Amino acid sequence: MSFLPSFILSDESKERISKILTLTHNVAHYGWIPFVLYLGWAHTSNRPNFLNLLSPLPSV
């Protein structure tokens, strides 16, 4: 397996890569449903006001 390049990373680089991967995992995990809801809201013909969507009171 001498044809595969070997990357020698410092401990600091490994820690940064680990933090970046953890951050992207959290963004994808917690941002998926709001993203899908936004896409559904953005592509409707009768788009309600965004503040009305966040209000717990029914809109008139």
UniProtKB/Swiss-Prot annotation:
Present with 3250 molecules/cell in log phase SD medium. It is a single-pass membrane protein. This is Mitochondrial import receptor subunit TOM7. Signal peptide: none annotated. Keywords: Membrane, Mitochondrion, Mitochondrion outer membrane, Protein transport, Transmembrane, Transmembrane helix, Transport. The chain crosses the membrane at residues 20-41. Component of the TOM (translocase of outer membrane) receptor complex responsible for the recognition and translocation of cytosolically synthesized mitochondrial preproteins. TOM7 is involved in assembly and stability of the TOM complex. Belongs to the Tom7 family. GO terms for biological process: protein import into mitochondrial matrix; protein insertion into mitochondrial outer membrane. It comes from Saccharomyces cerevisiae (strain ATCC 204508 / S288c). One of its GO terms (cellular component) is mitochondrion. InterPro entries: Tom7 (IPR012621). It is found in: Mitochondrion outer membrane. Residues 2-19 are cytoplasmic. Forms part of the preprotein translocase complex of the outer mitochondrial membrane (TOM complex) which consists of at least 7 different proteins (TOM5, TOM6, TOM7, TOM20, TOM22, TOM40 and TOM70). Residues 42-60 are mitochondrial intermembrane.
